[in-house]
Swiss-Prot record:
It comes from Arabidopsis thaliana (Mouse-ear cress). This is Transcription elongation factor TFIIS. A zinc finger (TFIIS-type) spans 336-376. It is found in: Nucleus. The modification N-acetylmethionine is found at M1. One of its GO terms (biological process) is seed germination. GO terms for molecular function: nucleic acid binding; translation elongation factor activity; zinc ion binding. NCBIfam families: TFSII (TIGR01385). The keyword Mitochondrion does not apply.
Length: 378
């Protein structure tokens, strides 16, 4: 089931990428193929566990920002459907847990039939010391049989208090065992995972005003992730510690890049700007959850730290610039009729231009594909 879901989504993703590269606006085979795959995903039965295991929900957000409006609208509808599934299953799970916690053990009641003619019962008390007392019970059955039994009752020994010390009936002191508050709290607290460090309650300072300010800015940026995360990301975000991550990032930046006022000032500014950018929630979330480690963060370029939306816009700008650049060049054709004088190969491209008067032959410009040798002739 998970593999089928991944295959369907990968097909839609490839078609959407092809449509974005080709610059298709609303029609085309890639757009139709992507929309058909997304409609199949709408009918595909998914659960919260399936979405978490395959992580297709995170990848679907890029299609919800696609430049083609048809793909964008269908992907947005599919994302809303999956969000409803996650919310409903989470609510059911919480309701089930609450029901199980409040459920009390049921006691089966047995009906007792009262005898119509109760038989007379004789009770005789027999004393046996101070600590116990026996009672002789005689009951006469309807068939004139007498049933005799002995019931023993024990007295609860009295405990006397003398000068703050409790003394039982045997004259021995009774010790009160008290549980300290620390032990009580440790007994009540649930056991934490051994490999998960506890969350910091306050930011660790290093007695350097500049470094402490950078840590405060990082904590402020990472704490915003909790309000930006989706429902299926909230569990991993809540398990992360923004204070500890901020301290780790700043410490590694200081260790590898030096002070923020030194030679790596621009690198500091680039990292801080992208982490605090309101349009770049993806980078903050990946750093907080550990998808991007502090070691990897300081090696990323400004383009790598950009948001998914910004990366897509940059790719479109590059494609358009490359297309505009090549549009002004002369059209070239491939041929094997020319032999390169440098490498002897016949893999060449050529184009012709009118460089002299109209009644003169055109000038042919040839380029060797193998060694990039250029020559011309008339």
């Amino acid at each position: 089931m998970e593999s089928d879901l991944i295959d369907l989504f990968e097909g839609a993703k490839k078609a959407a990428d092809a449509a974005a590269l080709d610059g298709v606006t609303s029609s085309g085979p890639e757009v139709s193929q992507c929309i058909d795959a997304l409609k199949q995903l709408k009918k595909f039965p998914v659960t919260y566990d399936t979405l978490v295991a395959t992580q297709v929900g995170k990848k679907l957000r890029s299609l919800a920002k696609h430049p083609v409006e048809d793909i964008k609208s269908v992907a947005t509808d599919l994302l809303e459907i999956w969000k409803k599934v996650v919310i409903e299953e989470t609510a059911k799970a919480k309701k089930t847990e609450g029901t199980n916690g409040c459920k009390e053990a049921k006691v089966n009641k047995m009906d007792v039939e009262k005898p119509s003619n109760p038989a007379p019962v004789k009770v005789q008390k027999l004393q046996r010391g101070d600590s116990a007392k026996s009672i002789k019970v005689e009951r006469k059955e309807p068939d004139n049989k007498v049933v005799t039994g002995v019931k023993i009752e024990r007295k609860v020994p009295d405990i006397k208090v003398t000068n703050g010390t409790k003394i039982d009936y045997r004259g021995q002191a009774v010790k009160d065992e008290k549980v300290s508050k620390d032990n009580q709290s440790s007994m009540k607290a649930p056991a934490k995972a051994a490999n998960a460090p506890p969350k910091l309650t306050a930011m660790l300072k290093c007695n350097d005003p500049v470094r402490d300010k950078i840590r405060e800015l990082l904590v402020e940026a990472l704490c915003r992730v909790a309000g930006e995360a989706d429902d299926y990301e909230r569990e991993s975000v809540n398990a992360s510690d923004p204070l500890r991550v901020a301290v780790s990032v700043e410490s590694l930046m200081f260790e590898k890049l030096g002070r923020s006022t030194g030679a790596q000032k621009l690198k500091y500014r680039s990292i801080m700007f992208n982490l605090r950018d309101s349009n770049n929630p993806d980078l903050r979330r990946r750093v907080l959850t550990g998808e991007i480690s502090p070691e990897k963060l300081i090696t990323l370029s400004a383009e790598d730290m950009a948001s998914d939306k910004r990366k897509q816009e940059n790719n479109q700008i590059k494609e358009k610039a490359l297309f505009d650049c090549e549009r002004g060049l002369a059209a070239k054709a491939s041929t094997d009729q020319f032999k390169c004088g440098r490498c002897g190969q016949r893999k060449c491209t050529y184009y012709q231009m009118q460089t002299r008067s109209a009644d003169e032959p055109m000038t042919t410009y040839v380029t060797c594909v193998n060694c990039d040798n250029h020559w011309k002739f008339c």
